[in-house]
Amino acid sequence: MRFSGMDMKGINMLFAAIPSICASSPKKISIYNEEMIVARCFIGFLILSWKSLGKTFKETLDGRIESIQESLQQFFNPNEVILEESNEQQRLLNLWISLRICSTVKVVESLPAARCAPKCEKTVQALLCRNLNVKSATLLNATSSRRIRLQDDIVTGFHFSVSERLVSGSTTLVEASTVEQIREAFLLEPRDLIREGFIVLRKVRVGGIPGTCGDGVGL
């Protein structure tokens, strides 16, 4: 049975008035009603405690009921509980990995090597450029030496060819002038060099060099 606010107030006033009435009664009534006084005082204490501590008890009971319900839910639905725990562990793992990556990046950025990286890069670039220049110079020297060797081989070949074409009775002046003309031709560019060489060789073959006859015999 529920009581309204006014009824509860009246009941409290009644319980508060009973001890005073019993205390003001004659001695026999007071002794006779000692058990009733104790019972009524205990009831009044319970009412006052319920008013002051009822909210705390209610919150405690609600929390206990909620925990019991969660335990029952975990007991009847273990898969959902395991899935939630797995998601929570995965979230914590991702958070831990992110924090570790951030700390690693911070440590790497704070290292002296990271500050010296631009200088090292410039040093590497300088070494590469120097090696490239050395290789280019070596290639140019090799090309020049091969060109000189080729010129010497061509001069030697023309010299032997002219010597075979000229007869033994030709003058030394004609042979010397022919070889000198060939050597002067090799001072030109490679294209002009080949052209002049063929001209000299043609003159030697047809006997067009001054001081020689058509059959290659000196005049």
From Swiss-Prot:
InterPro entries attached to this UniProt entry: ATP_synth_Bsub_B/MI25, MI25_plants
Single GO cellular component term: proton-transporting ATP synthase complex
Keywords assigned by UniProt, alphabetized: ATP synthesis, CF(0), Hydrogen ion transport, Ion transport, Membrane, Mitochondrion, Transmembrane, Transmembrane helix, Transport
Membrane protein topology class: Single-pass membrane protein
The keyword Ion transport is annotated on this UniProt entry: yes
Localisation per UniProt entry: Mitochondrion membrane
GO biological process: proton motive force-driven ATP synthesis
Molecular function per GO: proton transmembrane transporter activity
Record-annotated membrane-spanning stretches: 29-49
Pfam families from the UniProt entry: Mt_ATP-synt_B (PF05405)
Keyword Methyltransferase: no
Primary location group: mitochondrion
Assembly and interaction partners: F-type ATPases have 2 components, CF(1) - the catalytic core - and CF(0) - the membrane proton channel. CF(1) has five subunits: alpha(3), beta(3), gamma(1), delta(1), epsilon(1). CF(0) has three main subunits: a, b and c.
Family (UniProt): Belongs to the ATPase protein MI25 family.
Function: This is one of the chains of the nonenzymatic component (CF(0) subunit) of the mitochondrial ATPase complex.
Protein name stated in the entry: ATP synthase protein MI25
UniProt organism field: Zea mays
